[in-house]
Amino acid sequence: MAFSGMAFSDDLIKVARREWTRWGGPMEKIDGTLLGFTDPRMEAKHPFWTYVGEYWKSIGSNLDGRDDPAWSAAFICYCFKEAGAKKRFPYQDNHSIYVSQIDSGKFAGLSLEDPEATPLAFGDLLWASRTGHDCRTPPSSFADAKKELKKIREKKADSFCSHCDIVVELRIGEADVIGGNVKQAVTRTTYKLDSQGKIRDGRRNFVGIVKNVL
């Protein structure tokens, strides 16, 4: 359900925080310390797998949460849909696919920016490439990511493995983000920022920021 009387980014953050609370509030602190994880694979435990099933259902998938595919993109799509984005967001089961569609310029209010030059703002998506089982070699920089996204749009390349989190809180030198399938849960992570509010944390390979002014 969509919320009313608030900016879209506020609605999005409200949904992300609600889901994080539903999972019991697991966290990764800025020093890497983990808190609030009740099981190494929370996603496989009841009722958590049923929540994952809700995320899949939001993008029209028949997966019920007891399946193997990574569900972090489904989580992002669920949050946008619940916040009332409707057709203003490209709902897909893979981050690189929906980011490629955003990068096409066809989704007003959403744009892909260079993390080296762009301060984070509330409701932005912090995008990182990653490796993993059955993953092709991912881009290692914003420029490389832009090239790969163009190839995906032109159907000259397959999707690649990556991850997005929603920026939910900003402090001097720190950002809190919430994402799905982070250590097998919906997790709130604190990352380091520089003095200008740009991401400067070596725990992930950040290749883009989806600016969100919906």
Residue map of PLM features:
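Low-complexity, Gly/Ser/Thr/Pro-rich intrinsically disordered linker/tail segments
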Residues: 176, 181, 187-214
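Short intrinsically disordered, low-complexity coil segments enriched in acidic
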Residues: 1-2, 123
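Surface-exposed intrinsically disordered loops and tails
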Residues: 32-61, 104-111, 135-156, 195-201
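...with weaker cross-activation on analogous glycine-rich loops/strands in unrelated enzymes
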Residues: 86-184
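N-terminal capping segments
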Residues: 2-86
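A residue-level signal for beta-strand positions that form part of recognition/binding surfaces
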Residues: 9, 13, 174, 206
